Swiss-Prot record:
Main function: Testis-specific histone H1 that forms less compacted chromatin compared to other H1 histone subtypes. Formation of more relaxed chromatin may be required to promote chromatin architecture required for proper chromosome regulation during meiosis, such as homologous recombination. Histones H1 act as linkers that bind to nucleosomes and compact polynucleosomes into a higher-order chromatin configuration.
Stated name of the protein: Histone H1t
Bias type Polar residues, positions: 1-12
Organism domain of life: Eukaryota
UniProt note on tissues of expression: Testis-specific.
Post-translational modification: Phosphorylated in early spermatids.
Family of this protein: Belongs to the histone H1/H5 family.
Main location: nucleus
Cellular component terms (Gene Ontology): condensed nuclear chromosome; nucleosome
Modified positions (Phosphoserine) in chain numbering: S9, S141, S163, S178
Annotated site residues (Important for nucleosome binding properties) in this chain: Q54
UniProt source species: Mus musculus
């Protein structure tokens, strides 16, 4: 009898299923969404634009919009914001409305706001000048005091040397004068002796 080979199993073994990783992939630093730049504050740009105008009657709304557009502000999208900012600044007393009513008309800075801007500019210019000058005056004062202290000792020896010369000169004059006086005294003493001798001889002759 012929041997029969065992039949191959028809059942298939299922392949292992990979489980999805529970860890979330971290975002790359380069792909982080860039933040939108903050918009310009209209309440600050409007006073700056009005400070540049030299018109006494103020700046009209159309001219103000041109100045804001030149500064990089989107006037068309933010038209309503400009009008609201103008009303707020007028109510606060920062701006004065010279013509028109509401947001339409001409505007200019009030005296208080103008004086505040001038003071700020003066402080900035003073600080810039101080930086250009370099060291402050307080740091320069020790150098001047050192130079004065060095000059004073030099002046004192000159006075002492002058006085020394005067004393030496006076002593030399006295020494020179003293021999002359001695010589002048010696002849007088010799004459006195001769007179005494003559008187003695006369007396002796008279006695004889």
């Amino acid at each position: 009898m012929s041997e029969t080979a065992p039949a191959a199993s028809s059942t298939l073994v299922p392949a292992p299923v990979e489980k999805p990783s529970s860890k979330r992939r971290g975002k790359k630093p380069g792909l982080a969404p860039a933040r939108k730049p903050r918009g310009f504050s209209v309440s600050k740009l409007i006073p700056e634009a009005l400070s540049t105008s030299q018109e006494r009657a103020g700046m009209s709304l159309a001219a103000l919009k041109k100045a804001l557009a030149a500064a990089g502000y989107d006037v068309e999208k933010n038209n309503s914001r400009i009008k609201l900012a103008l009303k707020r600044l007028v109510n606060k007393g920062v701006l004065v409305q010279t013509k028109g009513t509401g947001a339409s008309g001409s505007f200019k800075l009030s005296k208080k706001a103008a004086s505040g801007n001038d003071k700020g500019k003066g402080k900035k210019s003073a600080s810039a000048k101080a930086k250009k000058m370099g060291l402050p005056r307080a740091s320069r004062s020790p150098k001047s005091s050192k130079t004065k202290a060095v000059k004073k000792p030099k002046a004192t020896p000159t006075k002492a040397s002058g006085s020394g010369r005067k004393t030496k000169g006076a002593k030399g004059v006295q020494q020179r004068k003293s021999p002359a006086k001695a010589r002048a005294a010696n002849p007088n003493s010799g004459k006195a002796k001769m007179v005494m001798q003559k008187t003695d001889l006369r007396k002796a002759a008279g006695r004889k």
